């Protein structure tokens, strides 16, 4: 069995139960322990309350009791742990990533404004955790009727043809392999090209869009060669499109079982951990679960 657990963060909300179900499936795929975690917001202490008083144990926690009932109902997982702790969820949840294979959360919990598409705890975990974080959206995220969940759909991954994120690609290929699903590798190129000219400069020759697409595809096919060699059983389709990468990935999410995106590498004078605009947009608007993968240590 895998030494690193798949962690499901629950809080008693329907979003948390959806995350629990997704995490249970993931634990089965990886042959890993499922750790069900409830981070209780720390209540204010009263004068009469003993200083050493802590949260109820896992056996007494009502949120974990609800989760345990759901796990027992679904079954099929050999090893499950239930953990309760107290503190600030937005700070404690990312810390669990140091010893986890995967951290899974719902897009919204019980706190905050119901109209928000992504909760602050989910955003903090996706931005700061050391392991991949999967955010499971609400089925009615589109604002209308509940959308079907494509559990058997392909895995979609966004990557740059010029500077690929190795950790993101490895995660996507592994997920596709374990699911026995196809992998759609989405890469976008800038179009139309924006050219800024200073006074006296001559405009460059017109760039042909077909040539730009051909060059981008050739780069993408080249960078994927090592992963195709390691995962020959995964059918791969390279999707090269102009313009908005986030919009294309959100479009892919309608039929995908999972969309995989990378978190930004560390940059000079920037926060140690950050997310780019594409990753944030996909988290906010995707119809399928989204995996946010931190960069490999060598790339940070």
Where are these regions (language model features)?
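Short beta-strand elements of ligand-binding domains
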Residues: 106-107, 133-139, 290-294
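Actinobacteria-biased recognition of intrinsically disordered, low-complexity terminal regions
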Residues: 1-5, 51, 142-151, 198-203, ...
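Small/aliphatic-rich secondary-structure junction motif
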Residues: 1-50, 151-206, 228, 236, ...
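General small-molecule cofactor/ligand-binding pocket signal
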Residues: 35-37, 81-85, 134, 184-186, ...
């Amino acid at each position: 069995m895998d030494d690193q657990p798949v962690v499901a963060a629950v809080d008693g909300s329907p979003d948390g139960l959806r995350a629990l179900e997704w995490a249970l499936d993931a634990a089965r795929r990886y042959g890993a322990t499922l750790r069900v975690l409830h981070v209780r917001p720390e209540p204010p202490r009263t004068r009469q309350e003993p200083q050493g008083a802590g949260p109820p144990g896992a056996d007494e926690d009502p949120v974990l009791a609800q989760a345990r009932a759901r796990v027992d109902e679904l079954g099929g997982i050999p090893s499950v742990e239930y953990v309760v702790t107290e503190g600030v969820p937005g700070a404690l949840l990312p810390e669990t990533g140091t010893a986890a294979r995967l951290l899974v959360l719902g897009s919204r919990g019980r706190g905050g404004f119901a109209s928000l598409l992504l909760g602050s705890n989910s955003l903090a975990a996706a931005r700061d955790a050391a392991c991949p974080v999967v955010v499971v959206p609400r089925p009615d995220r589109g604002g209308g009727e509940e959308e079907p969940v494509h559990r058997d759909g392909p895995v979609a991954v966004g990557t740059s043809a010029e500077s690929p994120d190795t950790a993101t690609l490895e995660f996507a290929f592994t997920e596709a392999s374990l699911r026995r699903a196809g992998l759609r590798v989405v890469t976008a190129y800038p179009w139309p090209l924006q050219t800024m000219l200073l006074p006296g400069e001559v405009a460059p020759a017109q760039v042909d869009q077909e040539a730009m697409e051909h060059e981008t595809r050739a780069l993408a096919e080249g960078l994927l060669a090592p992963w195709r060699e390691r995962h020959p059983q995964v059918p791969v389709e390279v999707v090269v499109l102009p313009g908005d990468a986030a919009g294309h990935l959100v479009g892919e999410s309608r039929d995908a079982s999972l969309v995989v995106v990378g978190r930004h590498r560390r940059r000079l004078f920037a926060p140690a951990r950050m997310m780019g605009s594409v990753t944030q947009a996909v988290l906010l608007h995707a119809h399928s679960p989204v995996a946010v993968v931190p960069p490999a240590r060598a790339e940070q």
